[in-house]
Amino acid sequence: RDRLSVTRLNDGRLKIKFTDQLLDEVIAESLRHISRKHDAYKIQVECEELILAHMDVRLIIQVLVNLIDNAIKYTPQGSTICIRGLRTDGRAQISVEDNGPGIADEMKSHIFEMFYTGKTTIADSHRSLGLGLALCHSIIEAHEGELTLKDNYPHGCIFVFTLPLSEVTLNE
């Protein structure tokens, strides 16, 4: 299913339905989709209020669920996973931070490629990301945003993506 989605996104056949959404509500909805999985983790959400972003909410929830699922999959139970939402440089910025083993430097340039799993042997504990990150990358690009990976020192990953802010302003 992911491969079909990536193909349809990349060749323009997947119709994107843009609406203006409050970022904190989209993050909360994403967490409802993974609620059964994250009981053994502390999920911390830090989101500035009233960030209205222009997005296809269904696709952005898919991106968030994928990034949070990866963080859960590769982080020891009992760990904290932090999701942040903020305004920066005229964009909405969302990050998912974990303190798992991280991703080796030599793999970082490949993680958004389709079918790249980051495994060299079956015994490796490296992340097996397959289509998920390629799909996330395509979705964010279709939103004229950017998906990047940073190191979370001393270990772990921070996946950061940006979305356009809504042109509508909310009266606070």
Residue spans for each PLM region:
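Short conserved segment of the HATPase_c
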Residues: 103-115
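Short alpha-helical Gxxx[C/S/T] motif in the catalytic ATP-binding
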Residues: 132, 136
